[in-house]
Amino acid sequence: MKINIALASTAAALVCLTSCMQEVLPTESVISDQIGQSASALEGMVNSIYTNMVGYKNEDGGIETISYGSMRVQLEHSTTMMVCPGYNGFNTMGAWTQGAVSASGSNRGIYPTYLYYGYIKTVNDVIGMIDLDNATDEMLVDLGICYAYRALYYMDLVQIMEYKKPLDSRYTYVDPKSDLSNLGVPIVTDKTTTQEASNNPRATVDEVYDLILSDLAEAEKYLAGYTRKDKVEPNLAVVYGLFARAYTNLASRTERAAKYTSKAEYWKLAGEYADKAIAQSGCTPLTEAQWTDPKTGFNNRNSQNSWMLATHIDPNNTTAATDGSFVYAMIMGTETTFSVYGWRVGRALDRAAYDRLSDNDWRKKSWLGPEFFYESKNQKAGEAYLIEKDANGNLINNKWATAGNNKSTEQGDWSDDPGKYQFSNSASWVRSRINTSYGFKAWPWLYVNRKFRPNEGNYNTYEVGGATDFPIMRVEEMYFLKAEAELNTTGVAAAKATLEGLIKTRNSSYSCAATTKKDVYEELMFQKGIEFWGEGINYFDNKRLETGCHRWYPGASVERAAHAIDMNRIHPGWTPGFNNAELNGNRAVYDFNNPYTAYSVYTTALRTNDEIASHYGEAIEVEGHKFFDTEKFE
């Protein structure tokens, strides 16, 4: 049920962000007096960290129930490889796809600051309640968990909120009111008073990383030797993984920093911590069977051996599994019959990325290409899939209408090989609904995903199928961070060896043909983009490396002019502003807010929906196709 958590230490949080925070919990309220009276009450408060991450809500702020995973994929909608086909008007994911993320003029861009400061409040409350002089070993572990999570939250938030001036000279942007160079976010800890919170300027990014690195050092100290009970708890391997992320971030922004300017040192540390995380975790990369399992694929932390840290929805927490329009299984589901948007809003891979990915790479099974929508049991012998057209180009196969809509809903008419498509639901059901009549204008060039499966493969029952786990950290990320660090230290050969070692577990014939640092970097980021599509990591990499957003080209699978973005280097839609509650409650931020440039400046002025549609199905040349701006790859 939904409860308010009232704690004496609310002074340690931003008043405007926490006055009406709600968590979607299956348990009763935990109040401050209980914390000091029993270890079990403290443990309940720690558990609220995990429940908060699968169901945060703030009704006063206009925040629907949203999870950590849903926030991450919301951010990823602003990147090149994430395409949003189908009926996606009037929804926040569509807004992020086009860059309509004003935090003061709508509810689209307000989620990051509300959500992360809500999370930070929870861990601050626990930290503030523990007396080090009288703490038990269990309490010290709780401290370690809280410090690790606080480092995670601030690391995410500072990357989201740091303003980077757009560099694409084709467009004119709104400038900030004040100089935002190297500014991060207001820092709120367990020691921040209410008075301080009401006049709390944006700390520099360097100062935020001071806190992050300090918190990780505390987490490392308190979690040393601890054997966790569940993957929702950070352990030492996760702390090392967070260190690897932090030093990768620092190495990538030395030219913007005031304090953290030792690029070579940070790349070296990033590689060392990635290695330590791999060794400490005992995790191995996902197998094809684990990845594609229709019942547990990307939804079960225990069956996914590579997952180092995860969120989890308790079976009794049906509200977190079903409430609102941001349930992760709903957002990313293709085969489900439940939800608000459900299968009518596709989450798809960019067409050029799909075409570039080798057919020998089993990760390609994560998306449905044109052959899936064309294939039927009466296809021509020897042909990969059926495409029959008359002289005018109209489809004439008896399963299709000239508009390209599937008119047959009979499973017997279609190829439903479970070994090939790995659906719990029938492939024919998916085909009969993902088509032009349901708003998928780019049909059959859709590339909608089936990477994220409903819990237990249950595509009918929301309370069950919606209760999915989400990977916060996977060991595969550590291999990519190691390869990137090697590319910036020991060189191309070492980075290629690490990259090839990982990708050969996905495609046994893989070989990286690139020979220069820039080209190896580009290939590394492409493979990482495929690996972590839909998990949010690509957003942080794109913004960190200023790779631009290149979702439009003739033959692209985008469906709306507002989504057809071709932006070099820094996309304005990556950076929301602070919400009105924060601006009004913390006047020190008011004149230092991130500016908002309307997406119409860089989208609809260039092309129309009809112009986009006229190019569907055109041949595209993958070799030389621009996926990333590579200036920072040198």
Regions found by a protein language model. Name each.
Residues Y87-K164, N199, A203-V208, A217-K229, ...:
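Conserved, well-structured interaction surfaces
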Residues G55-Y56, E265, A279-E463, T468, ...:
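Extended ligand-binding clefts on enzyme/binding-domain cores
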Residues I31-D33, S67-R72, M161-S181, G225-Y328, ...:
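Short, surface-exposed recognition loops and adjoining beta-strand edges that mediate ligand/DNA contacts
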Residues C20-Q74, D133, G342-V345, A353-D359, ...:
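Membrane-proximal, proline-rich intrinsically disordered regions
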Residues I3, A8, V15-E43, I212, ...:
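Bacterial Sec-dependent N-terminal signal peptides
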